[in-house]
């Protein structure tokens, strides 16, 4: 079966209603029922609970509490690299941005402008730059961390669809990551600006950041934007490896970096499993002379 045919049912499903229902159920305390759901989930997806800060599944009051579980200190050491991987997951794609086009899958590209919600001036910073797209499967740790030190300057909520973001859907739905609901976070770093976008999906109840809390719901039809620092509030500065947000059920992150001598980890390739804290990219050695 072709990828386009495989994703056809997703066009027909009531994705918003399913996602709302999943979020409702996942946030409710149901005692032994919750524990049994978690137990079955752990068994089905082979979740490694030994690395969780709390490995006792009966201690989680809701499925969301389990899904956003913390890791034990030292479970994800940081590599010595300019940029470290911000999540556990699998590489969807990475590489150069061609003018303003990001490669999604064979035959599919989407623009940086579309990804960030139509702001052409913001997108222009990443023309001919670099990108990385990482998919978080249900078994993965679902907190998102900083690839490098950064100071938050903007956050943009972009309403959209709620297609699944698994590899089959990425190959079958044009412009998937610029089509789905997303939260675009813009940071300033020592090497210039960068974007870390959290892309929603079917059953993803919500996305949250450490400085704002839950961004969605409520879901709306209009782009919403926040500028930082907010009036009367201190700057939001996060260090490399520090948590910046989380998914309540899994999805995808897309990172954008400006044009420059960035060299991705030579071991990286599409489909490869990656872990939070491993080396993602460094500045090319010849540019430091």
From Swiss-Prot:
The Swiss-Prot or TrEMBL record describes its family as follows:
Belongs to the phosphatidylserine decarboxylase family. PSD-B subfamily. Prokaryotic type I sub-subfamily.
Q: So which cofactors does this thing need?
A: pyruvate
In-chain residues carrying the UniProt-annotated modification Pyruvic acid (Ser): 251
Record bears the keyword Lipid metabolism: yes
**Does Secreted show up as a keyword for this record?**
no
Q: Name one GO cellular component term.
A: plasma membrane
Relay the cofactor remark from the entry: Binds 1 pyruvoyl group covalently per subunit.
Active-site residues (renumbered) = 88 (charge relay system), 145 (charge relay system), 251 (charge relay system), 251 (schiff-base intermediate with substrate)
Q: Which domain of life is it from?
A: Bacteria
Q: Write down the EC number.
A: 4.1.1.65
The way it spans or sits in the membrane comes to: Peripheral membrane protein
Q: In which pathway does it act?
A: Phospholipid metabolism; phosphatidylethanolamine biosynthesis; phosphatidylethanolamine from CDP-diacylglycerol: step 2/2
Q: What reaction does this enzyme carry out catalytically?
A: a 1,2-diacyl-sn-glycero-3-phospho-L-serine + H(+) = a 1,2-diacyl-sn-glycero-3-phosphoethanolamine + CO2
Q: What class of enzyme is it?
A: lyase
Post-translational modification (record): Is synthesized initially as an inactive proenzyme. Formation of the active enzyme involves a self-maturation process in which the active site pyruvoyl group is generated from an internal serine residue via an autocatalytic post-translational modification. Two non-identical subunits are generated from the proenzyme in this reaction, and the pyruvate is formed at the N-terminus of the alpha chain, which is derived from the carboxyl end of the proenzyme.
> Any idea what this protein is called?
Phosphatidylserine decarboxylase proenzyme
Give GO terms for biological process: phosphatidylethanolamine biosynthetic process
The job of this chain, per UniProt, is described as:
Catalyzes the formation of phosphatidylethanolamine (PtdEtn) from phosphatidylserine (PtdSer).
């Amino acid at each position: 079966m072709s990828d386009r045919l495989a994703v056809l049912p997703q066009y027909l499903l009531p994705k918003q209603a399913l996602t709302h229902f999943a979020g409702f159920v996942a946030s409710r305390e149901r005692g032994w029922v919750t524990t049994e759901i978690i137990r079955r989930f752990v068994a089905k997806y082979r979740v490694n609970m030994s690395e969780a800060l709390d490995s006792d599944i009966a201690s989680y009051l809701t499925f969301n509490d389990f899904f956003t579980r913390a890791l034990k200190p030292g479970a994800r050491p940081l590599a010595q690299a300019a940029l470290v991987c911000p999540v556990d997951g699998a590489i969807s794609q990475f590489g150069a941005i061609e003018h303003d086009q990001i490669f999604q899958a064979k035959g599919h590209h989407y623009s940086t402008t579309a990804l960030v919600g139509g702001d052409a001036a913001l997108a222009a910073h990443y023309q001919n730059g670099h990108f990385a797209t990482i998919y978080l499967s249900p078994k993965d740790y679902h907190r998102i961390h900083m690839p490098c030190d950064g100071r938050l300057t903007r956050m943009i909520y972009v309403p959209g669809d709620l297609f699944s973001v698994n590899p089959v859907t990425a190959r079958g739905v044009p412009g998937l990551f610029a089509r789905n609901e997303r939260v675009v976070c813009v940071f300033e770093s020592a090497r210039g600006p960068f974007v870390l976008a959290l892309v929603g999906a079917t059953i993803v109840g919500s996305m949250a950041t450490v400085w704002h809390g839950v961004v969605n719901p409520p879901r709306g039809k209009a782009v919403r934007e926040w500028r930082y620092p907010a009036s009367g509030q201190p700057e939001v500065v996060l260090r490399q490896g520090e948590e910046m947000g989380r998914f309540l059920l899994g999805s995808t992150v897309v990172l954008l970096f400006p044009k420059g001598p960035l060299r991705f980890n030579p071991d990286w390739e599409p489909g490869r499993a990656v872990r939070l804290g491993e080396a993602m990219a460094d500045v090319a050695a010849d540019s430091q002379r």
